[in-house]
Structures are given as structure tokens and as C-alpha cells.
Amino acid sequence: MSVQTSYGNWVSKRIIYLFGLVGILLVGLTLLYWAFSIPAALFISGCAFFAYARYEASCGRGKLQDRIRALVVENLEWTGEGKALDIGCGNGPLVVALAKKYPRAQVVGVDYWGGQWEYSQKACERNAQIEGVIERTSFQKASAVQLPFQDGYFDAVVSNLVFHEVADAKDKRQLIREALRVLKDGGAFSFQDLFLIKRFYGNTDELVSTLQSWGLAEVEFVATNSSKFIPRLFKLPFMVGTIGLIKGRK
């Protein structure tokens, strides 16, 4: 039996268990008072929805999270020469993808690896070993708020659905600025996040204008939430209905 990689799942088991447990408790309470039947149905339905979403995200026919993640690499206009950084690497899927696509590149992944998600540095290294890219990849614990690298250290920088999760940064645009700080002049970047949530980033046109004011050579917004492969059910605001991507060159 071949050894399998494990890249985790965006839909946590905890939310499925939570909805299921509350739903079961409410079902029991309906025996005492019928009014509990409505919230019971809602929680049981929520449990079923998130269980389906977890299946579809990682191992369903669509392999949705793999395809969404691939958009970051597809939009990175880079030659593959030099060093690349993935901010918030999780279990390392983007690091591995970059290392496999660009055989001459060295790729670094950073993450805070908190207990909220099913990710770890050990899992990253194991996946890189299985995928045959361990010699050209490395992983370290770091915060996206203050990256432990010199200005202009990397030739390419990527990130996928991470910035909105960083609680230490009230202004998520500062995370973009910090990511660009460690990118060389002329280097390529591709960041995907919940860019359509205005309380995080404001209007997308204004966001692009702000990035242009920082002196970037090129910057473009891509509405990846409208990708045809994303099922309509997953385009709800609390799923991936607000994702977008900014790409360009410093």
C-alpha cells in the first residue's frame, strides 16, 4: 500500500460534530416541547451540509479545495528561478505544488500552526517527503504580521485564504504590505483571500488603487469566486462566495 499525503480539509470536523450534537439534543427536547423541532431541523441540516462540504472539498469528485488552491499557482506569473514563499502553508500543498511545477526553485512555507486547524509542521515535512520535494522545501513557524525575512528576500510570494484568519492584524491590507516587503523588485505575487468582504479590504477597486500607490509595477484583481467549477451551493457568502485573487509584479 502506497503512503498517502494528508493536506487537511478547510471544513473542520469540529463544526460538523457541533451541529450534530446540538441537533441531537434539540431532537430530544422536542419530546418535551414541540417548538424545539424547528431549531433541531436547522442544526441537523447544518450538520449534513457541512459533512457534505467536507467530503466535496477534499475527496469528492470535484476536489474543490485542490482546484481553488490551484488558482493561486495558475495566476503566478513567475519563471520558477530562485526562492518562493507561501504564507500560511497549512500542511504544505501550495509549497509542494510550486516545488513540483518549478524544479529549479527553493520553496519556503510559513504558518503559525495553531490548534484551530488540522495542520502542523511535521505534516508539511511528511507530505514534502512523500511528494519527492523535501530537498527543495523548508517549513518554519512564523506570523504573517511580521515575517522573519529580510526585505526583498524572495522571488515569488503566494498565499491562499489565510490573511482573513490572522487575528493580530485589524487592517488586513497590512498583511499584503508585509508579504510584499519580502518580495524582490520585479518579483511575482499571487494572493487569494476573502477580498470581496468589504470590512476586511473595502471596495476591490479601492484595494487595487491602494496597492498601486505602493509602487507596484503590476497589480490585478481576479474574481475567482465566479469560477465555473465551483458548485452554486459553495458560492454562499460563508463558503467561498467572497473569494478573489490579487496578482502582479512588484
What are these regions (language model features)?
Residues 80-90, 108:
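Conserved class I S-adenosyl-L-methionine
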Residues 145-157:
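A short acidic, Gly/Pro-enriched loop at the edge of an enzyme's catalytic core
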Residues 186-193:
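Conserved beta-strand signature within the Rossmann-like core of class I S-adenosyl-L-methionine
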Residues 7-17, 49-72:
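Class I SAM-dependent methyltransferase Rossmann-like catalytic core
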Residues 172-185:
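A short glycine-rich, Lys/Arg-flanked "PGG" loop and its adjoining helix->strand segment in the class I
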Residues 91-103:
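Conserved SAM-binding loop of SAM-dependent methyltransferases across substrates and taxa
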Residues 228-250:
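Core SAM-dependent methyltransferase catalytic element
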Residues 132-144:
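Conserved SAM-binding strand-loop segment of SAM-dependent methyltransferases
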